């Protein structure tokens, strides 16, 4: 009988990536097949996020529901991973004895051994250690599930912003070797992936080891990924302004594969609040980065994160944030009311902004951003946008859907063979959360590169010297 696995994922794109790797890993080692129905699963995994308020209580509420399933099926294995697992550790077991496995973001690769331990001994196991890059060395080969894919290039963060739990839950910055990243991207390209999104908590701090003992910077990695045939779009997330260096900006001048869209969190427009957050930059320095970016790529569109109601935020501080939003003219944003995270320096600050004031400021900020989003969308009316077709539309199975380079969802009439390919679409209608258009050019009418597998590249470029020894000649 086929064994079933169900994973519930909360949080960031890194968590989504980790969950996909868990499913692939347990599929390859134990033969588990994915199920959307928790009630029919043999293993239930909860991949958690601790960024938002009451994250722990949300976890224990879910575990309470899963406990009922375990009462019906005592052989059911329940595991908790992610950032809440890193924070809570053994405490999860004390509050929820139904949990068999507690693992951190850096120990998910040990899940097969943990499951074997539980199945063999019927005793629980907790492993929330930080074994650095070992995680990536033990994960299965990448498997494409469409024309877009996430590729993790680094883990952790060294910035220790006062509001953030990431350094405590995912550890400090560790970069994957550049060759490992490039080989994974090439494998995905060979499976039909056309767009990659490079992931990291602080992705522009990437410093990956090279095969010859050197160090590959993030700017160099971007150019190397862009050189892989079949990869026509590159995104990345998330960045920190203090490491958004000139060499990264220069990539926007000469690498068209890098999309004209950037998520660069600023959090606040007030220098006083930025100092309290330990962001290590000012609003003026942030604006200087944006000026350089727009000089390198005039059509670039920007998004940001904003924390509303940080301890000590005055009306004047908030107005400085609103001024920054207007001056930069952000396309989109992810904005949240501040909530204290246990164990962070900000948790010891006096949270003196009332909830009503926080909600009012959030409404004002989001309303302004929504106006700017609509303005950007209206400017696209009548323009031709290149779309990567991701599949059928959620609005109608008779239509296709895909994203522009600036991350707008576009619905249009097309044929099934377009899925996984690029098409040029004229925008004919602007809706609240999407666009509509008409196909004016198919991929066959474009001059795009054909992907090659890593094996075919090696075979094509392999030479033999006078002794018959194979050498690689790029």
UniProtKB/Swiss-Prot annotation:
<feature type="domain" description="TRAM">
    <location>
        <begin position="378"/>
        <end position="441"/>
    </location>
</feature>
<comment type="function">
    <text>Catalyzes the methylthiolation of N6-(dimethylallyl)adenosine (i(6)A), leading to the formation of 2-methylthio-N6-(dimethylallyl)adenosine (ms(2)i(6)A) at position 37 in tRNAs that read codons beginning with uridine.</text>
</comment>
<protein>
    <recommendedName>
        <fullName>tRNA-2-methylthio-N(6)-dimethylallyladenosine synthase</fullName>
        <ecNumber>2.8.4.3</ecNumber>
    </recommendedName>
</protein>
<dbReference type="GO" id="GO:0005829">
    <property type="term" value="C:cytosol"/>
</dbReference>
<keyword id="KW-0408">Iron</keyword>
<feature type="binding site">
    <location>
        <position position="12"/>
    </location>
    <ligand>
        <name>[4Fe-4S] cluster 1</name>
    </ligand>
</feature>
<dbReference type="GO" id="GO:0035597">
    <property type="term" value="F:N6-isopentenyladenosine methylthiotransferase activity"/>
</dbReference>
<dbReference type="GO" id="GO:0046872">
    <property type="term" value="F:metal ion binding"/>
</dbReference>
<dbReference type="Pfam" id="PF00919">
    <property type="entry name" value="UPF0004"/>
</dbReference>
<feature type="binding site">
    <location>
        <position position="164"/>
    </location>
    <ligand>
        <name>[4Fe-4S] cluster 2</name>
    </ligand>
</feature>
<dbReference type="InterPro" id="IPR020612">
    <property type="entry name" value="Methylthiotransferase_CS"/>
</dbReference>
<dbReference type="InterPro" id="IPR038135">
    <property type="entry name" value="Methylthiotransferase_N_sf"/>
</dbReference>
<dbReference type="InterPro" id="IPR005839">
    <property type="entry name" value="Methylthiotransferase"/>
</dbReference>
<dbReference type="InterPro" id="IPR007197">
    <property type="entry name" value="rSAM"/>
</dbReference>
<dbReference type="GO" id="GO:0051539">
    <property type="term" value="F:4 iron, 4 sulfur cluster binding"/>
</dbReference>
<dbReference type="InterPro" id="IPR006463">
    <property type="entry name" value="MiaB_methiolase"/>
</dbReference>
<feature type="domain" description="MTTase N-terminal">
    <location>
        <begin position="3"/>
        <end position="120"/>
    </location>
</feature>
<comment type="subunit">
    <text>Monomer.</text>
</comment>
<dbReference type="InterPro" id="IPR002792">
    <property type="entry name" value="TRAM_dom"/>
</dbReference>
<dbReference type="InterPro" id="IPR013848">
    <property type="entry name" value="Methylthiotransferase_N"/>
</dbReference>
<keyword id="KW-0808">Transferase</keyword>
<keyword id="KW-0411">Iron-sulfur</keyword>
<keyword id="KW-0949">S-adenosyl-L-methionine</keyword>
<feature type="binding site">
    <location>
        <position position="49"/>
    </location>
    <ligand>
        <name>[4Fe-4S] cluster 1</name>
    </ligand>
</feature>
<keyword id="KW-0004">4Fe-4S</keyword>
<keyword id="KW-0819">tRNA processing</keyword>
<dbReference type="Pfam" id="PF01938">
    <property type="entry name" value="TRAM"/>
</dbReference>
<comment type="similarity">
    <text>Belongs to the methylthiotransferase family. MiaB subfamily.</text>
</comment>
<feature type="binding site">
    <location>
        <position position="83"/>
    </location>
    <ligand>
        <name>[4Fe-4S] cluster 1</name>
    </ligand>
</feature>
<feature type="binding site">
    <location>
        <position position="161"/>
    </location>
    <ligand>
        <name>[4Fe-4S] cluster 2</name>
    </ligand>
</feature>
<dbReference type="InterPro" id="IPR023404">
    <property type="entry name" value="rSAM_horseshoe"/>
</dbReference>
<feature type="binding site">
    <location>
        <position position="157"/>
    </location>
    <ligand>
        <name>[4Fe-4S] cluster 2</name>
    </ligand>
</feature>
<dbReference type="Pfam" id="PF04055">
    <property type="entry name" value="Radical_SAM"/>
</dbReference>
<keyword id="KW-0479">Metal-binding</keyword>
<feature type="domain" description="Radical SAM core">
    <location>
        <begin position="143"/>
        <end position="375"/>
    </location>
</feature>
<keyword id="KW-0963">Cytoplasm</keyword>
<dbReference type="InterPro" id="IPR006638">
    <property type="entry name" value="Elp3/MiaA/NifB-like_rSAM"/>
</dbReference>
């Amino acid at each position: 009988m086929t064994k079933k696995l169900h994973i519930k994922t909360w949080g960031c794109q890194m968590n989504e990536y980790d969950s996909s790797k868990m499913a692939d890993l347990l599929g390859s080692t134990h033969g588990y097949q994915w199920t959307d129905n928790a009630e029919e699963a043999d293993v239930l995994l909860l991949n958690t996020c601790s960024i938002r308020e009451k994250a722990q209580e949300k976890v224990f509420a879910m575990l309470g529901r899963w406990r009922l399933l375990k009462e019906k099926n005592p052989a059911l294995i329940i595991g908790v991973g992610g950032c809440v697992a890193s924070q809570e550790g053994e405490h999860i077991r004390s509050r929820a004895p139904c949990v068999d496995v507690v693992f951190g973001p850096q120990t998910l690769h040990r899940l097969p051994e943990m499951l074997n331990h539980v199945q063999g001994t019927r005793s629980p196991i907790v492993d929330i250690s930080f074994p650095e890059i070992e995680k990536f060395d033990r994960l299965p080969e990448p498997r494409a599930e469409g024309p877009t894919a996430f590729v993790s290039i680094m883990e952790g963060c060294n910035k220790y912003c006062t509001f953030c739990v990431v350094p405590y839950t995912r550890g400090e910055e560790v970069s994957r070797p550049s060759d490992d990243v490039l080989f994974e991207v090439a494998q995905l390209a060979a499976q039909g992936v056309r767009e990659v999104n490079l992931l990291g908590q602080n992705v522009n701090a990437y410093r990956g080891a090279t095969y010859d003992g050197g160090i590959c910077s993030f700017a160099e990695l971007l150019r190397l990924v862009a050189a892989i045939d079949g990869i026509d779009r590159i995104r990345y997330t998330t960045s920190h302004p203090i490491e958004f260096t000139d060499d990264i900006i220069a990539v926007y001048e000469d690498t068209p594969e890098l999309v004209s869209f950037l998520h660069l969190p600023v959090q606040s427009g007030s220098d006083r609040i930025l100092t309290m957050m330990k962001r290590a930059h000012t609003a003026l320095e942030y604006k200087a980065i944006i000026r350089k970016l727009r000089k390198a790529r005039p059509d670039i569109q920007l998004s940001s994160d904003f924390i509303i109601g940080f301890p000590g935020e005055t009306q004047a501080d908030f107005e400085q944030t609103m001024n920054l939003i207007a001056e930069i003219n952000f396309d989109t944003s992810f904005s949240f009311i501040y909530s204290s995270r246990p164990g962070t320096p900000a948790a010891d600050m006096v949270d003196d902004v009332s909830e009503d004031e926080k909600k009012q400021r959030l409404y004002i900020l989001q309303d302004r951003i929504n106006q700017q989003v609509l303005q950007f969308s209206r400017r696209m009316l009548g323009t031709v946008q290149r779309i990567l077709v991701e599949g059928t539309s959620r609005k109608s199975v008779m239509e296709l859907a895909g994203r522009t380079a600036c991350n707008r969802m576009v619905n249009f009439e097309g044929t099934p063979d377009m899925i996984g390919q690029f098409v040029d679409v004229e925008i004919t209608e602007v809706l609240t959360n999407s666009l509509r258009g008409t196909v004016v050019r198919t991929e066959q009418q474009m001059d795009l590169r054909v992907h090659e597998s890593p094996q075919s590249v090696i075979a094509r470029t392999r030479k033999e010297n006078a002794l018959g020894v194979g050498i690689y000649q790029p």
